[in-house]
């Protein structure tokens, strides 16, 4: 009895750590856009307003995923949703190296935003599953914010170093994509907790229909 309990705690700790690192990895790119925009302006001779599309595209993707894809975690499960988001993000990140046009980059940023949004629907649902109390849920979310903050520092720092050495900003996305690939492998190896499919709404609706038929 003791060994399975220890194994469960160890597995849960791995899940939490992976989730924290995933949020940190996403922050590395989303919070580096401010440094990339001046490079985009120089390369494509754009106005600041036009170059701002780099920021809008990512956020629009996140918003669209949150509004229209929020049910994926309940429909397909936490792990598949998280892995799908990570895979989509990794693919978009690697494609930056192949791009040479501003519209192409903007589309990739929108796709990466959708990927982040999909990931977040799965990750936030997972956090709700593994938290045993409101206090624990708050603690996990605070740690997530902390790791996101670390990524917000590390990403721009790496990008600044790349630019100082004359290396294209695209390689930050390659780095993020590589980290993402490692996280995908790790996520497929860890045992995620089982989640019950949401049926309460259906049951409630069926009861209401029966009640209307039999007043």
Task: Annotate each PLM feature.
Residues 102-104, 143-191:
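Helix-loop-helix hairpin linking two adjacent transmembrane segments in secondary transporters
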Residues 31, 58-67, 153:
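Residue-level signature of mid-helix packing/kink "hotspots" within the transmembrane helices
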Residues 18-19, 103-109:
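Short hydrophobic/alpha-helical segments at membrane-entry points of transmembrane helices
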Residues 14-42, 46-48, 120, 124:
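Extracytoplasmic
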């Amino acid at each position: 009895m003791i060994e399975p309990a220890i194994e469960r705690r160890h597995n849960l700790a791995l899940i939490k750590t992976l989730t924290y690192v995933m949020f940190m990895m996403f922050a590395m790119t989303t919070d580096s856009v401010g440094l990339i925009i001046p490079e985009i302006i120089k390369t494509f001779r754009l106005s600041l307003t036009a170059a701002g599309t780099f920021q809008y595209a990512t956020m629009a993707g996140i918003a669209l995923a949150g509004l229209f894809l929020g049910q994926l975690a309940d429909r397909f499960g936490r792990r598949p949703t998280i892995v799908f988001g990570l895979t989509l993000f990794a693919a978009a990140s690697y494609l930056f190296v192949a791009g040479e046009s501003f519209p192409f980059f903007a589309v990739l940023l929108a796709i990466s935003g959708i990927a982040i949004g999909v990931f977040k629907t799965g990750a936030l649902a997972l956090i709700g599953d593994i938290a045993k109390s409101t206090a624990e849920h708050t603690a996990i979310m605070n740690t997530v914010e902390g790791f996101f903050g670390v990524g917000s520092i590390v990403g721009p720092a790496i990008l600044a170093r790349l630019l100082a050495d004359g290396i294209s900003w695209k390689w930050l996305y390659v780095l993020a994509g590589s980290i993402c690939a490692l996280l995908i492998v790790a996520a497929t190896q860890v045992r995620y907790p089982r989640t019950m499919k949401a049926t309460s709404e259906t049951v409630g609706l069926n009861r209401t229909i029966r009640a209307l038929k039999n007043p």
